[in-house]
């Protein structure tokens, strides 16, 4: 979130709120984007939201979903990865000799498109740094996939199969997105 704020918002934030950044950081790196808090951002379907609300909007918790999934399927879950703090490559910390192929990802939300546009960060780096709209991965057998999707949807949280796992000579993640194929 700190990176997003500095990548998206302009220097007027630093001038108005000098306590919002560490004075030891080079000035050219702080609030280097072009947006103000009140700039309208297109979020699709003819709707807009201010940049401030978009960047600072709360994140829903997965706790109720995960509790219900664990209550019913704990012994069938092969892995769970919360993609914050490691993004789409975080799973690399937990595997050996597996290839994780993510080729059916959710659409990238407007917030991450805005960060990409403002920061000029490559899409490959975006998937390595940000969750890109999906924060939780469950690695489960095909037989229980629909049950888990149904549980998630009962809490009005979208869920879908985003890829698959294959054996490999080494650990690897491949992301296939509208913005390219990236191998980590």
Label the model's feature ranges.
Residues 1-184:
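Helix-biased detector of long, well-ordered alpha-helical tracts
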